[in-house]
């Protein structure tokens, strides 16, 4: 099985270099046994302790007579793209909650006379990192944060326009994510202001995401929540709220039909199948909303596929939805949002709740 080791908290980390690079600092951490010459250190996200783990291990290896090295593989920002290239700005949008800012690497500029892009956290920590390296090895092998990175992504770009367009779409998606996070009270308004600034700097508008005007128009037409889905080939469908199911379910079924070439008038799931599910939800499970969620509709579709060849065809078309774009005119439930993501669909929604209840799932 997998082993585990303890990492101790070090007082005044990372500023107290003398303490950090001592037996009372990194020396208190447990040594990680390895069997290969190259070890990859990965973690769930930023601030998880990847760099601290690597530096601690360097200290531990040095004590054992092994002069190990360290390099960082990080895709964004891309060091050899312009500071304000949309790809690099998309990285800022993705890390708006961390307040990351792309910057010209001053250490690289001074050392090599070359302009490269890095981000504030790496630039701010580099003097500390440099001192730690010198304390362990007597010298630092890197002259800049850019030196420390391993990143060839910029050389792999063969269609700059496609990368720019993908970046625009990512920034718009991140804008909606931040707007909804602020609405839910799990993010500060400053995060949304950062996204708005990035949108304005590139002259972006949310209508550039095709599903947004489509969902808004359907909601205005019906006076109820609506959703829109853009298939990978660019075709667009919408879904409206009904007594049987929510707009997300309707849009999902319509997308499946379109992808599978099934006539829009065909009912994939018999009302006789849906009615007992609604009865179960209301009468036995205590739900007040009889409309079905996406997971319930997909289960009903899979049951129908046993006896209905058209429903079976629809089930097989689910995989073709991966990479589709989804937008809802209201904040989706965690169930519906999670289901779209599990299907590999990129989902956004307006920062508006469907109801005015105090608690939202």
Protein language model features and the residues they cover:
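N-terminal pre-Walker A segment at the start of P-loop NTPase domains
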Residues: 7-28
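Phosphate-binding P-loop
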Residues: 30-36
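N-terminal leader/propeptide and maturation segments of large enzyme subunits in energy/redox metabolism
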Residues: 122-191
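Short, small-residue-biased leader/transition segments that mark boundaries at the very start
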Residues: 2-6
């Amino acid at each position: 099985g997998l082993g585990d080791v303890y990492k101790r908290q070090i007082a005044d980390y990372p500023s107290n270099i003398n303490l950090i690079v001592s037996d009372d600092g990194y020396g208190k951490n447990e040594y990680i046994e390895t069997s290969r010459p190259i070890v990859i250190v990965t973690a769930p996200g930023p601030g998880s302790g990847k760099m601290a783990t690597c530096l601690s291990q360097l200290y531990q290896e040095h004590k054992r007579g092994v002069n190990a090295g360290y390099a960082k593989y990080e895709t964004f920002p891309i060091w050899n793209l312009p500071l304000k290239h949309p790809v690099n700005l998309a990285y800022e949008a993705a890390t708006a909650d961390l307040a990351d800012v792309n910057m010209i690497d001053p250490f690289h500029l001074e050392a090599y006379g070359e302009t490269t892009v890095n981000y504030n956290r790496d630039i701010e920590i580099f003097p500390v990192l440099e001192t730690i390296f010198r304390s362990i090895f007597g010298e630092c092998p890197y002259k800049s944060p850019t030196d420390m990175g391993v990143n060839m992504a910029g050389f792999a770009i063969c269609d700059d326009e496609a990368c720019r367009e993908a970046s625009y779409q990512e920034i718009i998606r991140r804008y909606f994510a931040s707007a909804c996070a602020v609405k839910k009270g799990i993010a500060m308004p400053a995060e949304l202001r950062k996204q708005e600034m990035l949108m304005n700097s590139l002259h972006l508008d949310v209508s550039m995401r095709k599903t947004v005007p489509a969902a808004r128009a359907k909601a205005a037409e019906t006076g109820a929540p609506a959703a829109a889905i853009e298939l990978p080939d660019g075709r667009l469908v919408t879904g409206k709220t009904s007594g049987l199911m929510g707009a997300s379910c309707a849009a999902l079924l319509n997308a499946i039909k379109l992808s599978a070439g099934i006539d829009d008038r065909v009912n994939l799931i018999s009302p006789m199948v849906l009615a007992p599910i609604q009865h179960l939800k209301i009468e036995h499970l205590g739900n007040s909303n009889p409309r079905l969620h996406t997971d319930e509709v997909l289960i009903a579709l899979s049951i129908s596929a046993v006896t209905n060849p058209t429903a079976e065809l629809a089930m097989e078309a689910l995989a073709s939805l991966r990479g589709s774009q989804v937008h809802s005119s209201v904040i989706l439930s965690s169930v519906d949002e999670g289901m779209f993501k599990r299907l590999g669909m990129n989902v956004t929604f307006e920062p508006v709740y469907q109801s005015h209840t105090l608690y939202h799932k």
